[in-house]
Amino acid sequence: MQKLTEQSPEFIRAIAPYKAGKPVSDVVRELGLDPNTVVKLASNENPLGLGEKAKAAIAQAAMDLGRYPDANGFALKAKLAARHGVKPEQITLGNGSNDVLELAAKAFLTQGTNAVFSQYAFAVYPLATQGCGAQSKVVPAVCFTHDLDGFLKAIDTQTHVVFIANPNNPTGTFLPQEKLLAFLKQVPSHVLVVLDEAYNEFLKPEDQYDSTQWVSQFPNLLVSRSFS
């Protein structure tokens, strides 16, 4: 008799579970440490805790927890659109940027297609690609950063998505806007370029750029940001 798990696609069964940043409570329990002596740096978390304005906003929002929230995020999209100078209908919300990355993969990848990303890429890229049954085309890094010329050579007729983290996670390397724009101009229009800017706010002032304005120039560009 066939096992229930054998009925799922082979590419799903081959996925190794994603290992998120270990909670401090787990480290304390496993190693018998004082929680006040443990410093966690792995998950981009604020060690200072919630600010007073955030606490007040949460308390106010708690008054409406008996109701489902607006599934389309109308108010949040309106404020984000005003902040970034785009239209609300250009914004997609997710449960963290991981959710947006996975939605992009599910929307554009399937068996017989492929996604291109760097040798040192965010762990979610290969997982999201494999979860759709697509092939991962991994481009060797140059000095721990993205080789955009290598990306262009790797793109073929079956490439549907290119993932680029800038600044890159986990290497911390950065591509200036001139290189990104030159790359975008050469990417075929059938390929979705996902520009993952989860660490955008960490850039030096002289390195900062506004990629949200590029989406009007490149219809195949998706810019991902994160509140974390």
Segments (PLM) and residue ranges:
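Glycine/Thr-rich phosphate-binding loops of Rossmann-like dinucleotide-binding domains
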Residues: G49-G51, L101-A104, Y125-P126, T171-G172, ...
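Short glycine-rich anion-binding loops that position phosphate/pyrophosphate groups of nucleotides
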Residues: N44-N46, S97-N98, F122, N166-P170, ...
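Short hydrophobic alpha-helical segments of the AMP-binding
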Residues: L80, Y125, T129, V187
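PLP-dependent aminotransferase-like
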Residues: A107-I164
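Short acidic capping loops at alpha-helix termini that bridge into adjacent secondary structure
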Residues: N36-T37, K87-I91, Q111-N114, Q158, ...
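N-terminal small-domain helix-loop-helix segment of the aminotransferase-like
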Residues: Q2-G96, L103
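Short, structured coil segments at secondary-structure junctions
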Residues: K87, C132-G133, Q217-F218
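Active-site pre-lysine segment of PLP-dependent enzymes
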Residues: L148-Q158, P170-V193, E197-S228
